[in-house]
């Protein structure tokens, strides 16, 4: 099993707890298309419960033989971003990427340079913000027979100071995984567990404790049930009594509908509930 990136050591549990729940926005739409000359387009739009709308247009060109990918994004805030990726050119498993952003309204500019190096039992990354600081964030994970251990650290060059550090351990198996992370300078601890019970049922949970704020432990549990090959339902609830449900179905080839809702079970008589929908079109 491939060694994940540091931020993905608890990915299975985090995806089960957070992905495909549609209540966070009143409505979202995503349109994807591909051209014969290796150019992919994606248009996204979102309307929040506060009636704020936003959107983005993305174009991506991929040259697989040379390991080159160029992505250009333009959003409704009139922010422009260009991302250039080069994979496996200098060394097998090494990917370099440059991210350049520009906001015409304020003339703000951004430039970032990132490195990803992946081998069978190692996954390391380095993120450099060239115009702010500059700053560097580096993380790495080593793995052996499913066992994982990793750490991350941030450094501000101008201040000559470490800006933060984290650590994590985990275990990944084909049908289950577990991870313990310590973030925010080893002050916020999380333990997560994921289990693929069978081809239809998945279950997971996550407990979080912030040593700076007290003894209260936050808990979330979630499950996913695949009804048939084209649809599934998900549900979750946390220790505060906030529950969420979601339904996802492939209406036809290239068209997916998602519907979700959240409820505060402690305040069922109040207008704290949220409902959202999502449409995805892909060609």
Swiss-Prot record:
Annotated keywords: Ion transport, Membrane, Mitochondrion, Mitochondrion outer membrane, Porin, Transmembrane, Transmembrane beta strand, Transport
Cell compartment(s), UniProt: Mitochondrion outer membrane
Pfam families according to UniProt: Porin_3
Gene Ontology CC: mitochondrial outer membrane; pore complex
Single GO MF annotation: porin activity
Domain comment as written in the entry: Consists mainly of membrane-spanning sided beta-sheets.
Alphabetical list of PANTHER family matching this protein: GH26960P-RELATED, VOLTAGE-DEPENDENT ANION-SELECTIVE CHANNEL
Function as written in the Swiss-Prot or TrEMBL entry: Forms a channel through the cell membrane that allows diffusion of small hydrophilic molecules. The channel adopts an open conformation at low or zero membrane potential and a closed conformation at potentials above 30-40 mV. The open state has a weak anion selectivity whereas the closed state is cation-selective.
Family stated for the protein in its record: Belongs to the eukaryotic mitochondrial porin family.
Identification of the protein by name: Mitochondrial outer membrane protein porin
Species this protein is from: Neurospora crassa (strain ATCC 24698 / 74-OR23-1A / CBS 708.71 / DSM 1257 / FGSC 987)
């Amino acid at each position: 099993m491939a060694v994940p990136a540091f931020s993905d050591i608890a990915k299975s549990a985090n995806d089960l707890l957070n992905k495909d729940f549609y209540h966070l926005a009143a409505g979202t739409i995503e349109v994807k298309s591909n051209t014969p000359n290796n150019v992919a387009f994606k248009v996204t739009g979102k309307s929040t419960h506060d009636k704020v709308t936003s959107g983005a247009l993305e174009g991506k060109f991929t040259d697989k033989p040379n390991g080159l990918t160029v992505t250009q994004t333009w959003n409704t805030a009139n922010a422009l971003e260009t991302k250039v990726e080069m994979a496996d050119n200098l060394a097998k498993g090494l990917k370099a990427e440059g991210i350049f952003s520009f906001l015409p309204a304020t003339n703000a500019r951004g430039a970032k340079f990132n490195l990803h190096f992946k081998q069978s039992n190692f996954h390391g990354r380095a993120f450099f913000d060239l115009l702010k600081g500059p700053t560097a964030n580096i993380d790495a994970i080593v793995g052996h027979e499913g066992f994982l251990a990793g750490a991350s650290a941030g450094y501000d060059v101008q201040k000559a100071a470490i800006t933060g550090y984290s650590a994590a351990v985990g275990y990944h198996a084909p049908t289950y995984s577990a991870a313990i992370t310590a973030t925010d300078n080893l002050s916020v601890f999380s333990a997560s567990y994921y289990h693929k019970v069978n081809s239809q049922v998945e279950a997971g949970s996550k407990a979080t404790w912030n040593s700076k704020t007290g003894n209260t432990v936050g808990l979330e549990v979630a499950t996913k049930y695949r009804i048939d090959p084209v649809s599934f339902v998900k549900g979750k609830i946390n220790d505060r009594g906030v529950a969420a449900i979601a339904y996802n179905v492939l209406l036809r080839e290239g068209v997916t509908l998602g519907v979700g809702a959240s409820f505060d079970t402690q305040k069922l008589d109040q207008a704290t509930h949220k409902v959202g929908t999502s449409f995805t079109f892909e060609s």
